[in-house]
């Protein structure tokens, strides 16, 4: 049941690819941010954190396509009120076949090559692909809106 929440976002991402919503050309590696929002089971936060910070990063970064990961905790200060999920894992994926990467994750969860924990309470997951390059405040200092747009587009 907990795995179902994790898999929901992968199905949405796969559908986006089928409908042609991902940028790029066939056979060209694309970059994705796979974001998993979750909580720890009540009374199991220590186990949850140990699993996520060690075992889960260990397992998923061994899957072809997964290139990096970063784990976050909800800040005490929020722009628009507190959120129900206290944790966010951002997985960076680079692949020309996202559905196959997610199929590999599902297969590994099913056969035990990727260890899961009963301390995980899924909220939701989503996968995003970039529209612009990453832009810093330093890059745009003194630039016009048009210049910033060109920087964001990588021109």
Language model feature labels by segment:
Residues 9-20:
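Bacterial N-terminal signal peptides
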Residues 1-11:
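Bacterial N-terminal signal peptides that target proteins for export
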Residues 23-155:
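Macromolecular interaction modules
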